[in-house]
Design a protein with these regions (language model features):
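The substrate-binding groove and active-site-proximal loops of carbohydrate-active enzymes
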Residues: 1-7
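Active-site-proximal substrate-binding groove within the catalytic cores of carbohydrate-active enzymes
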Residues: 8-143
Length: 143
C-alpha cells in the first residue's frame, strides 16, 4: 500500500510540474482520509460531504485546526426548498475558508439567489485576507 501511495504521489508531482496552475480538489472521502502528503500537493481539501448547514457550521468552525484557511473547502448547499435564513447560514459557514458553492442554484427564488450572489461578492472582497488569517478559538473548539 505504501508503494502504491508513493507511486501516486510521484505521478501527481509530475502532473503539477507539467501544469503548475492546475487546481484539483482532494476529496479524501469527504475529508475523512485527509493526510499531509496530499495536503502538501493539492490546493483545495474538501472538509466534508455533509449537506446539513446546521451541522456544517461545526466543521467550518474547526477546519482551521487541520487545514490552512485558503485550502479548506467548505461546501455551501442552499437547499431548493429552504428559506432565506438557511441560504444566509450556508454562505456564512463558508466565508472564512474556501467556498465550494453547490446545490440547485437555478431553482432558488430570486431573493435567495441574490443572497448567494451577495455572499460570493463579499467573499471575493476578503479572500486575499484569508490566506494571511490565523484561526482563533477564544472559547475553545466548537462542538
Amino acid at each position: 500500500m505504501l508503494e502504491h501511495e508513493r507511486a501516486y504521489l510521484k505521478w501527481l508531482d509530475g502532473v503539477f510540474e507539467k501544469y503548475p496552475e492546475l487546481v484539483i480538489e482532494n476529496c479524501s472521502s469527504g475529508g475523512l482520509r485527509t493526510d499531509y502528503a496530499m495536503l502538501a500537493r493539492y490546493s483545495i481539501q474538501s472538509t466534508s460531504d455533509h449537506e446539513d448547514y446546521r451541522n456544517y457550521a461545526t466543521i467550518a468552525a474547526n477546519a482551521g485546526a487541520a487545514l490552512t484557511p485558503e485550502q479548506a473547502a467548505i461546501w455551501s448547499y442552499p437547499l431548493k426548498d429552504g428559506d432565506e435564513e438557511e441560504t444566509i447560514y450556508n454562505m456564512v459557514n463558508a466565508l472564512l475558508l474556501r467556498i465550494h458553492q453547490s446545490g440547485h442554484l437555478a431553482q432558488l427564488s430570486k431573493e435567495r439567489h441574490a443572497l448567494v450572489k451577495e455572499g460570493i461578492e463579499y467573499y471575493k472582497s476578503i479572500r486575499q485576507d484569508i490566506k494571511k488569517a490565523l484561526p482563533v478559538w477564544p472559547n475553545g473548539f466548537a462542538t
